[in-house]
A protein has these predicted regions:
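AMP-forming adenylation/ATP pyrophosphatase catalytic core
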Residues: 1-174
Length: 174
């Protein structure tokens, strides 16, 4: 288990507020995953396998002695490494958006499919029973950018993202 410090330059980037006219280059920068390695933090413990943990998880780490609780920020099952940070407001735990590759999008109706370059505002949730959040969707050739009005905690690969307009489910994907 590797702790990631909030003192890294990575977490000193400004948090941007979005409307539907922000540049697509900025979107690609903010929805890119960051790679961590052991040089970014320090080894603080051992675990039984990175595949047993999920982003945002707090319980089950069996590591204490920190001012704030530790949360899982990222896992790497190839190297069996878990990256953690202190506090639920850690810079890597809360994200303004996400990117969904084109092959992972599953449109419920073909007439709702967005064209390349098209953008639309819906309400979205990324976990069961989460309140609906305003989101701006930008369709690009390689996939879909979702930029939320509010930061989203622990966006995790494999989650559902569903969006709605007027309480009607428009799109769902994994």
């Amino acid at each position: 288990i590797v702790e990631i410090s909030t003192d890294l330059d990575l977490f000193k980037k400004p948090i941007y507020q979005f409307d539907c006219i922000e540049s697509l280059q900025l979107l690609k920068t903010l929805t890119t995953s960051y790679n961590f390695n052991e040089n970014d933090g320090k080894i603080i413990g051992e675990h039984q396998g990175a595949h047993y943990y999920t982003i945002g998880q707090r319980k089950g780490l069996a590591i204490g002695g920190y001012k704030l609780p530790l949360f899982i920020l990222s896992t790497n099952t190839q190297t069996n490494t878990i990256y953690v940070g202190q506090g639920e407001n850690h810079g890597s735990l809360n994200r303004p958006g996400l990117f969904i590759p084109k092959n992972d999008i599953h449109w419920l109706r073909n007439d709702l499919e967005l064209n390349i370059g098209e953008k639309v505002v819906y309400q979205c949730r990324i976990r069961y029973r989460q309140k609906l959040e305003n989101v701006c969707l930008y369709m690009q050739e390689d996939g879909l950018h979702l930029i939320f009005e509010n930061l989203q905690k622990a966006i995790t690969p494999g989650q559902f993202a569903t969006w709605y307009k007027n309480d009607e489910l428009k799109i769902g994907l994994v």
